[in-house]
């Protein structure tokens, strides 16, 4: 019985740590948005907790849009 309780507490602890790590800023969980314009601008966005390059159209989109990978990582990890 005690082993089950300990295992449950460990699982809850890991889930709690994961939620804190990924909830740094709500904008980091937004899907990258290309926007409405037709430009082809390399940008970075947080996807699944990692900063990845995407092509931004130049207007519209959302706040998950960074000029450099370093800027993305500073904000979203």
UniProtKB/Swiss-Prot annotation:
Keyword Secreted among record annotations: yes
Broad class of the protein's primary localization: secreted
Disulfide bond entries: 28-76, 37-59, 51-72
Keyword match DNA-binding: no
Annotated localization: Secreted
Positions of the BPTI/Kunitz inhibitor domain: 28-76
Leader peptide range in chain numbering: 1-23
Pfam families: Kunitz_BPTI (PF00014)
Distribution of this protein across tissues and organs: Expressed by the venom gland.
Keywords, comma-separated and alphabetical: Disulfide bond, Protease inhibitor, Secreted, Serine protease inhibitor, Signal
GO CC field: extracellular space
Superkingdom classification of source: Eukaryota
Single GO term (MF): serine-type endopeptidase inhibitor activity
PROSITE patterns for the chain: BPTI_KUNITZ_1, BPTI_KUNITZ_2
Residues the record marks as site: Reactive bond for trypsin: 35-36
Entry's family note: Belongs to the venom Kunitz-type family.
Function: Serine protease inhibitor.
PANTHER family: BPTI_KUNITZ INHIBITOR DOMAIN-CONTAINING PROTEIN, KUNITZ-TYPE PROTEASE INHIBITOR-RELATED
Name of the protein in its database record: Kunitz-type serine protease inhibitor cvp2
Record organism: Pimpla hypochondriaca (Parasitoid wasp)
UniProt lineage: Eukaryota, Metazoa, Ecdysozoa, Arthropoda, Hexapoda
């Amino acid at each position: 019985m005690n082993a089950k309780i300990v295992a449950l507490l460990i699982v809850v602890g890991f889930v709690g740590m994961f939620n804190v790590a990924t909830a740094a800023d709500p904008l980091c969980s937004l899907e990258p948005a290309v926007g409405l314009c037709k430009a082809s601008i390399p940008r970075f966005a947080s996807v699944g907790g990692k900063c990845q390059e995407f092509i931004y159209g130049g207007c519209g989109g959302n706040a998950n849009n960074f000029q450099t990978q370093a800027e993305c990582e500073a904000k979203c990890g």
